[in-house]
């Protein structure tokens, strides 16, 4: 049984893998599977009082469970998007379309997806794509 549950509606604005140093540190892994949703598409259905927030920056509010410490999502208010950790969404099929921040990768991935040095231009990045 989970202390916190959430649901999303519609489709994510972006889904992929992030290789940035912040995600590596936060997830204790070389790659983080992300799904970015419009803020209005994400709803806490259980345990809202059990959610704590770590304000990494004014553009990044990390949400985690007070009971187990599990990572839930990161709110990016400037972009009006919420990064819900893809593996938390029951029934959600993660269909990645890109690699973000591949310039700081710890491991190489050969999967044919575009690999952005930082972020796609639509998310405020350079849009520069690196070789597969």
Question: In which residue ranges do the predicted regions lie?
Answer:
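A short Gly-Trp-Pro
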Residues: 3-132
């Amino acid at each position: 049984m989970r202390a916190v549950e959430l649901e999303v509606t519609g489709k994510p604005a972006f889904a992929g893998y992030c290789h940035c140093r912040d995600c590596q540190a936060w997830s204790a892994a070389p790659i983080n599977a992300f799904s970015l949703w419009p803020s209005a598409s994400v709803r806490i259905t259980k345990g809202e009082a059990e959610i704590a927030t770590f304000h990494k920056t004014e553009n990044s509010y990390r949400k985690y469970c007070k009971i187990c410490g599990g990572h839930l999502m990161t709110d990016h208010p400037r972009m009006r998007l919420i990064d819900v950790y893809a593996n938390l969404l029951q029934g959600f099929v993660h269909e990645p379309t890109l690699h973000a921040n591949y310039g700081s990768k710890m491991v190489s991935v050969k999967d044919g997806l575009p690999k952005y040095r930082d972020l796609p231009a639509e998310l405020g990045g350079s849009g520069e794509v690196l070789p597969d």
